[in-house]
């Protein structure tokens, strides 16, 4: 189930996420270079927090598992892709970065490269991808 969050809910989850910074499981989720003030945020199945934040006129999508005790279901993955498609129609382009050592996120990048028109860049540590909605892909 996808739930769009209000500002109070976002603030509560951000506090929880901040507490993960010392947890080794989450070591690949943080990059302290930018403040995160989401334009929109969602929760999928009480497990995945997804936010869409604008940096320099580009929408970045962030995804974090906030409840590693809950098992991932195929429905969660379907909901994530559904949300991505909906927000791509809204924002027209979405970027995402990850540490390549974060195998789950890096696999998601590879999937996006196969499914969508995108540009990508990789260095030794990070992968960055930008997905662009083309005119031919827009549905009325």
Task: Describe each region flagged by the PLM.
Residues 1-28:
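Short amphipathic alpha-helix that is part of the acyltransferase structural core
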Residues 31-36, 47-58:
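A conserved beta-strand-loop-helix scaffold within acyl/acetyltransferase catalytic domains
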Residues 41-45:
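Cytosolic beta-strand hydrophobic patch enriched in CBS
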Residues 55-69:
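Conserved acetyl-CoA binding element of GNAT-fold acetyltransferases
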Residues 72-87, 107, 111:
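Conserved acetyl-CoA-binding loop-helix of GNAT-fold acetyltransferases
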Residues 95-110, 124-126:
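Conserved beta-strand-loop-alpha-helix junction that forms the acyl-donor binding cleft
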Residues 97, 115-132:
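Conserved catalytic-core motifs of GNAT/GCN5-like acyltransferases
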């Amino acid at each position: 189930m996808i739930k769009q969050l209000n500002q109070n809910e976002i603030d509560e989850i951000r506090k929880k996420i901040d507490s993960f910074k010392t947890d080794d499981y989450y070591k690949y989720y943080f990059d302290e270079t930018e403040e995160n003030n989401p334009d929109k945020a969602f929760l999928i199945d009480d497990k995945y927090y997804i936010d869409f934040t604008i940096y320099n006129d580009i929408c970045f999508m962030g995804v974090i598992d906030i409840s590693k005790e809950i098992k991932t279901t195929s429905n969660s993955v379907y909901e994530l892709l559904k949300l991505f498609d909906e927000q791509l129609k809204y924002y027209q382009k979405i970027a995402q970065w990850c540490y390549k050592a974060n195998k789950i996120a890096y696999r998601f990048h590879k999937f996006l490269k196969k499914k969508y028109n995108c540009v990508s860049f990789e260095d030794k540590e990070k992968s960055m991808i930008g997905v662009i909605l083309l005119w031919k892909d827009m549905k009325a």
